[in-house]
Each structure stands twice: as structure tokens, then as C-alpha cells.
Amino acid sequence: MEKEINYASSYVARVTMDVMGELFQGARLTMNWLADCARLIASRGQPVAWFSPVGVPVVQPYRQSKSYTIVTILQNLVLSSSDDYLPIHKQRQVTAFPPNYVHSLDSSHMLLTALEMRKRGLEFSAVHDSFWTHPSDVDEMNIVLREVFTDLYERPLLEELKRNWELRYPDLIFPALPEKGTLNLEEVKHAPYFFQ
């Protein structure tokens, strides 16, 4: 039964990703570029590392684990070690990087929003991508969210990432950046919703 469930979920995931790729071709090309770069870095036995837009250093910790089984009279205990001296887990480095990079962008947006809210004397709280303030300040928070978002994404983030990697991994030749889309970020400031 477990085999059938794995097969079915893999099939559904593949179909979903294919449809998403058709609907959001630019995003798919960017995700593919991120994965290709991660594959290149991992092929040299290096963990994928980068700086978030606010300067936080990020290193993916995925390494092959080493298991030890301890047999006792009461039970068998399996201990797993994933120390820094172990080789990287290449597949996890590749598959985890695109979403991890996006999370670093999201967290940068959250931090920059919190700083701007504080600068304006407004309360702010957040969990993951859910942002809160007092009901009387929601309209102002929506303005701040959009201003910070457009300021962040007006930066050439992929170019910055590639330049950083070219310095960090000088022996690697990274593929050309994906083509930029046509979204006018200024429209986000006036849209009722971020995505329509």
C-alpha cells in the first residue's frame, strides 16, 4: 500500500508542477535556474551558500548521515550523525535550494516590513507569511508591505546571487540568468491584492 501511495503522490506532484510550469513559466524558469546552479555547486561537493537580501549568511546543512545501531537487551537504538565532516547530500542540496532561497526572500521582506513599521511607530507581529497589526493600522500596514516589497524586488536579486556565487565558487561557470518578466512592480502598490 505504501508503494502505491508514493507512486500516486509522485504522479500528482509531477502533474501539479507541470501545470504550474505552464501557468507561471517565468517562475518555473527561475526555479530551474536556481536548481541548476545548486546542482553545479553540489557536484563539487560544496554546500549551497548565499546571503539573504538583508545580509544574513545561509548555508544549507544537508549532509549524508551516518547511522549507528546500538543493540541492548531492551531495544535497538539507531543514532544518526550528520556532522560537517560528512559529504554533502547532493540531491537534497539541489531540491531544497529553490524553496529555501524563496524563504530567504520572504523572511527579508518580513524583517524589512517590521523595521519600517517600527520606524512609523506602528505595532507589528508575524508568523511565517502572516503579518498582523492593530485593526486601526491595517491600511497603513498594507501600504508598508507593498512599499517594502517593491523596494526589495526592484533590486537585481538574482544578479546579486550570481555575483556572490562567482566570488564564492570561482572555479564554477554558472548558467546565464533567466529572462526577466514584464511585471511592473509599481502596480503592486495600488493593487487590492498582491497577486490576482
Language-model region placement:
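Conserved catalytic core of nucleotide polymerization and phosphodiester-bond processing enzymes
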Residues: M1-Q196
